[in-house]
């Protein structure tokens, strides 16, 4: 063993001052426990500007009481140029404060010691077994460095724990190497590996003749935590009794604000806090400053002036003035670390629904129409679909011919109960015009129906005459009074909108021609009953007319004046008048659904949240 041995650490930022306090306290405790208090010195390397301009007198006194030797050093020559050159690689680590760690090359200038064990200020020796490194590296040379493999890349060593031999020549060559080359990681660990580690030589010829050597030591002398998934839990549990030293790597240290609030603490984190509490108690520090609040934020500039403790009362004005300045800096650091309060005034405004979209939504999905319908209408409609019972005679009493004063598809639309009184009055005033148009067009319409019925009579299944008679008798409607043109005529939901038929002759029955589109849908009506109720009903009406045979027409002729045969015979007399009346094209029931109850049947198929925007 060498005569002059030292355990050294480095302080290049005031943010690491709590770590320097805890490390020095723990090392002294373990040296005393091992009985080597006088054999191994403790040394602190600190930059001159930090010690003289930043630290308070109390901090200086505490450091001098912990470490037997404090060495003030200056930054490396051309350090600013080196930092600028290594900035790109250093950005990969997202640790800008490590740019000042290049001063670690000054360790080889400690020629007053024969061998040095270097420990980062964020390390914590757990027991005195870590002192065995001096025995393991007792034959170390100046060209060797003893270190532990880095968990992120095991072919490289971690520079947080190193055994080295101070040497002036090695220090000079190393510092020149730092100036001339770019560090792998932009910091001290990369450049020291490039200088001492043969694994970093990409040239095989140079690697074989490499003059320096990395001596790999056991991982138990530098267990880095947290390892963020790299750590093997079984191995950690197995080698736990053999661990000599813990290294708190990463941005968040045990003394940082983030770690104190958010970090998932483990037993080693708790051990560091216990050591710091012992340090505080031994030096009788105020409880209010026992846990310095150091910012976790990355710094791109020189570290600010911060002290972790308040000075005791003193009569020296210069000391009090310095302490006040440092306290102000601590308050600023607290404000920087405070979480910002969310401002409700700047909360993002809700995205309003465009007006066009609102109109589109209310046009296609009219829920008021569905809610205003009587309940019995929907029940009766469902019953009709189930039993397929449609009364042709009663439907004819409620159908109106197309004319220029009516809207398309009004013959098959359910009139809303909320119609304005003005519309009723206007409809009554147009009755005379409507009656004339209907009388003139009856003969042509019934001729079309008769032709369609005769062509399809052979392929259609005729219904039972008895059942038809009963259905007709049960559903026959009564002639409404002139004062109520809007009154419901039958139970099949088919009404005449705003047109009174009280002036029609008893022997004339209006009827509407059949459109080709209805015949097309009738062929494929299976499965469409629920979605196309109006079309289905109109087809059923026309088909029922096709089912009548000659005997059925004769039987119904004597029972009522509103039968289909009587209407046909009466309308055929008006052929001459009908030729003078222009034929109006029937609406396309495939698309003219706005005035029908089509939406009231299909709207329930859409869930409430089908649209992306919510209409307020």
From Swiss-Prot:
CDD domains: GT8_Glycogenin. The keyword Cell wall biogenesis/degradation does not apply. Residues 450-461 have a biased composition (Low complexity). Residues 283-302, 377-386 have a biased composition (Basic and acidic residues). It catalyses: L-tyrosyl-[glycogenin] + UDP-alpha-D-glucose = alpha-D-glucosyl-L-tyrosyl-[glycogenin] + UDP + H(+); [1,4-alpha-D-glucosyl](n)-L-tyrosyl-[glycogenin] + UDP-alpha-D-glucose = [1,4-alpha-D-glucosyl](n+1)-L-tyrosyl-[glycogenin] + UDP + H(+). Keywords: Cytoplasm, Glycogen biosynthesis, Glycoprotein, Manganese, Metal-binding, Transferase, Vacuole. UDP-alpha-D-glucose binds at residues 10, 16, 95, 104, 120, 122, 158-159, 185, 188-189, 250, 253. SUPFAM superfamilies: Nucleotide-diphospho-sugar transferases. Self-glucosylating initiator of glycogen synthesis. It catalyzes the formation of a short alpha (1,4)-glucosyl chain covalently attached via a glucose 1-O-tyrosyl linkage to internal tyrosine residues and these chains act as primers for the elongation reaction catalyzed by glycogen synthase. Capable of transferring glucosyl residues to unbound acceptors such as free oligoglucans or oligoglucan derivatives. Residues 283-320, 335-354, 371-516 are annotated as: Disordered. This is Glycogenin-1. Its main location: cytoplasm. Mn(2+) binds at residues 120, 122, 247. Residues 400-419, 462-485, 492-503 have a biased composition (Polar residues). Its cofactor is Mn(2+). GO terms for cellular component: cytoplasm; vacuole. Glycans are attached at residues 230, 598. It is found in: Cytoplasm; Vacuole. Signal peptide: none annotated. One of its GO terms (molecular function) is metal ion binding. Its EC number is 2.4.1.186. The record marks 104 as: Important for catalytic activity.
């Amino acid at each position: 063993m060498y005569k002059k041995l030292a355990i050294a650490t480095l302080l290049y930022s005031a943010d690491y001052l709590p770590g320097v306090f805890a490390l020095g306290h723990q090392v002294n405790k373990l040296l005393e426990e091992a009985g080597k208090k006088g054999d191994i010195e403790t040394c602190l390397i600190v930059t001159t500007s930090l010690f003289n301009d930043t630290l308070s007198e109390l901090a200086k006194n505490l450091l001098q009481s912990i470490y037997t030797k404090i060495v003030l050093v200056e930054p490396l020559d051309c350090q600013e140029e080196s930092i600028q050159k290594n900035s790109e690689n250093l950005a990969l680590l997202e640790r800008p404060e490590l740019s000042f760690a290049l001063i670690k090359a000054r360790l080889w200038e400690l020629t007053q010691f024969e061998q040095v064990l270097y420990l980062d200020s964020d390390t914590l020796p757990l027991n005195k077994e870590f002192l065995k490194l001096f025995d393991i590296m007792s034959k170390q040379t100046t060209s060797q460095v003893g270190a532990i493999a880095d968990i992120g890349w095991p072919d490289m060593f971690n520079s947080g724990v190193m055994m080295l031999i101070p040497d002036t020549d090695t220090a000079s060559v190393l510092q020149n190497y730092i100036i001339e080359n770019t560090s792998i990681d932009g910091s001290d660990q990369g450049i020291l590996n490039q200088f001492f580690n043969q694994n970093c030589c990409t040239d095989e010829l140079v690697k074989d003749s490499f003059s320096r050597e990395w001596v790999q030591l056991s991982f138990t002398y530098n267990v880095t935590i947290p390892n963020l998934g790299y750590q093997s839990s079984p191995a950690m549990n197995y080698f736990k009794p053999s661990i000599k030293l813990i290294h708190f790597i990463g941005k968040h240290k045990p003394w940082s604000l983030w770690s104190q609030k958010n970090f998932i603490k483990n037993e080693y984190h708790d051990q560091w806090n216990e050591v710091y509490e012992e340090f505080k108690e031994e030096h009788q520090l105020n409880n209010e400053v026992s846990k310095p609040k150091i910012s976790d934020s990355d710094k791109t500039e020189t570290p600010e002036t911060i002290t972790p403790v308040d000075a005791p009362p003193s009569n020296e004005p210069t000391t009090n003035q310095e302490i006040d300045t440092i306290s102000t800096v601590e308050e600023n650091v607290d404000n920087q670390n405070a979480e910002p309060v969310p401002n409700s005034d700047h909360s993002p405004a809700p995205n309003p629904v465009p007006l066009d979209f609102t109109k589109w939504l209310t046009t296609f999905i009219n829920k008021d129409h569905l809610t205003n319908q009587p309940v019995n209408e929907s029940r009766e409609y469902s019953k009709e679909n189930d039993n397929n019972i449609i009364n042709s005679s009663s439907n004819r009493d409620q159908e109106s011919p197309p004319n220029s004063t009516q809207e398309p598809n009004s013959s098959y639309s359910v009139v809303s109960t909320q119609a304005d009184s003005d519309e009723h009055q206007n409809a009554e005033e147009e009755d005379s015009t409507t009656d004339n148009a209907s009388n003139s067009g009856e003969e042509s319409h019934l001729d079309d129906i008769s032709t369609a019925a005769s062509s399809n009579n052979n392929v259609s299944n005729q219904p039972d005459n008895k059942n038809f008679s009963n259905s007709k008798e049960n559903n026959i409607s009564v002639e409404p009074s002139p004062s109520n043109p809007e009154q419901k005529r039958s139970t099949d939901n088919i009404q005449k909108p705003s047109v009174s038929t009280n002036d029609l002759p008893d022997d004339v029955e209006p009827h509407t021609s059949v459109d080709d589109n209805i015949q097309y849908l009738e062929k494929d009506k299976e499965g469409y009953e629920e979605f196309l109720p109006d079309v289905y009903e109109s087809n059923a009406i026309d088909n029922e007319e096709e089912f009548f045979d000659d005997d059925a027409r004769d039987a119904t002729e004597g029972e009522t004046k509103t039968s289909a045969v009587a209407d046909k015979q009466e309308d055929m007399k008006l052929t001459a008048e009908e030729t003078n009346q222009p034929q109006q094209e029937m609406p396309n029931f495939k698309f003219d659904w706005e005035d029908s109850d089509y939406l009231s049947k299909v709207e329930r198929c859409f869930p409430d949240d089908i649209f992306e925007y919510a209409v307020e």
